[in-house]
Amino acid sequence: MLELIVCRACLGCACSFSFAGLGMIAQRIFSPAGFAIAIGLGDSALGIGGVIGEFGVDYFGERLGWREIMLATALIGVPLAIGCAWSLRSKLFAQIQSTKEHDTIPATLTMTRQIQSVLKKREVILAVLIYGGTCGMIMGFGGFWNIPLQEAWGWSPHESVILNSVFFIGTAIGAPIAGILSARIGAKKLLIVGVVISILSYIFDLMFPPQWIMTNVADWPLWVDCVTMFIIGFGLGTSILAFPIATRVVAPEMVGLTISIVNFSGIFFAAILQVAPGVIIQGFQDTTLIALQVGHSVFVLGMLMALAATLCLPSHTQTAHI
């Protein structure tokens, strides 16, 4: 058990480093608007990976053991990651020199002081809350709790996997679109629209089961719930705008740290939102539909936190044009 925990922790660290590295490279190559698109494409890849993982485990789970599946993914992922890193130009990994516009050279500060200087920015704090509520929903709901909820509605395990995969497809499509539109519409407006439609769609899926809505129809079509899942994921795709919101107010040499802080918030809240529903459900005598509904209410609270933080953003919050 200890070995498994250590391996999972190392895997999580590797993923965190890779996302921060992606942000740093994108910030050096692209304009602010291009940075938003690049982060959106990176998050889109995460959504596509979620879809592949869902279908892969569903298909190979009955044919192979979990060890074999993990080994196969490692054999594919490790050389792929090494090849991607090797193909990048070395200057993209060079240290960013601070500009003379700043009184204090961040390189001379301790890590604690650097974190404090970043967290003094109001937009960074708001971005942390935005990404915490939205990424926590994506990882907590899509990463675990969606399938038990769909099975409680009466869908088969295979149909529940399809619904969860459609949720990740929505995030994969919504993230790059949010990055593209942020230069024209503005990050704040996009976030408000995205989070609101996700909240409303999620409440609809949570509170109104097919048996209640269509009491006179024996077969509730799967595609209707697929549309709902897609809308939820699509709206949450705007979560990537938290990164350009946070990084545009810090010095270039602080971008990597800022991305790491925002990303930490998303993973931290994801961990909380994976545990919290289970703690609530344990208060019930059995895992009934009502227990799952009550447990899933924490995801609504997370998205409401993100919405409240978005509303507190300055009205001029907008990514620069490409």
Where are these regions (language model features)?
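Cytoplasmic helix-loop-helix junction between adjacent transmembrane helices
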Residues: 7-45
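Helix-to-loop junctions at the C-terminal end of transmembrane segments
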Residues: 174-186
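C-terminal ends and interior cores of transmembrane alpha-helices
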Residues: 197-218
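Cytoplasmic membrane-interface "Motif A"-like loop-to-helix N-cap segments
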Residues: 183-196
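Extracytoplasmic gate region of multi-pass secondary transporters
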Residues: 122-175, 273-278
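Helix-loop-helix hairpin linking two adjacent transmembrane segments in secondary transporters
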Residues: 42-93
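Paired small-residue
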Residues: 2-10, 223-231
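Juxtamembrane intracellular "pre-TM" segments in multi-pass secondary transporters
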Residues: 94-126
